[in-house]
């Protein structure tokens, strides 16, 4: 607690802020889904550190044709829950950011939001704000779209798991890299998506370096 005291960092939320955070419905209403672009049937996954507890961004991937893909970057739509001038909004404004210490995280928002409602956990429907691109393997963008969406994350990966598949060029995650500690095989279409995304990222990086 010494660092928290030294820098005047708040480590507990006022009870009225926690009450407001606990008042939200967990289930997303059909009306809300109707007002959003639906990506629940598009392959979607998160890639984060092994120790991550909140997953605030996800990738979706769909092959459209031989050399054309739809790639989505989805960010948790916190604004759906944290409305202007509410107690939650004021508390988040005061905190400004989440603080990551060696042994703990001091979150900007109560855990029911940061680790639950706004965390893009696997096998759960979540509200997001998205940037979606139609792109080829070279990284050329043909179409772009931005807006509110609903997603369903199919998989949660750690960086080490994805790196293992990329380096081995196989859909196998070795036990030493696995989140579960046991070796497992990823479905072929998921492995192909990871390979394609890696290839696009490499081409974009090379392009940037030339400039």
Predicted regions: what they are:
Residues 1-211:
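Electropositive polyanion-binding surfaces
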């Amino acid at each position: 607690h010494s660092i928290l005291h030294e820098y005047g960092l708040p480590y507990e939320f006022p009870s009225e802020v926690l009450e407001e955070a606990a008042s939200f419905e967990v289930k997303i209403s059909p009306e809300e889904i109707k007002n959003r672009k639906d990506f629940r049937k598009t392959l979607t996954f998160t890639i984060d550190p092994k120790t991550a507890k909140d997953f605030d961004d996800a990738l979706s991937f769909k092959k459209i044709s031989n050399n054309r893909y739809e790639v989505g970057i989805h960010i948790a739509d916190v604004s759906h829950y944290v409305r202007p001038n509410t107690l939650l909004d004021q508390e988040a404004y005061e905190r400004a950011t989440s603080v990551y210490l060696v042994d703990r995280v001091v979150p900007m928002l109560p855990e029911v939001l940061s680790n639950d409602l706004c965390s893009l956990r696997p096998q759960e429907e979540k509200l997001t704000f998205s940037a979606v691109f139609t792109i080829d393997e070279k990284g050329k963008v043909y179409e772009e779209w931005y807006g509110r969406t609903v997603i369903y994350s199919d998989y949660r990966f750690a960086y080490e798991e994805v790196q293992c598949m990329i380096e081995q060029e196989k859909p196998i995650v070795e036990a030493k890299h696995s989140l579960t500690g046991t070796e497992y095989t990823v479905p072929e279409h998921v492995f192909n998506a990871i390979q394609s995304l890696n290839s696009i990222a490499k081409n974009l990086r090379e392009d940037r370096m030339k400039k």
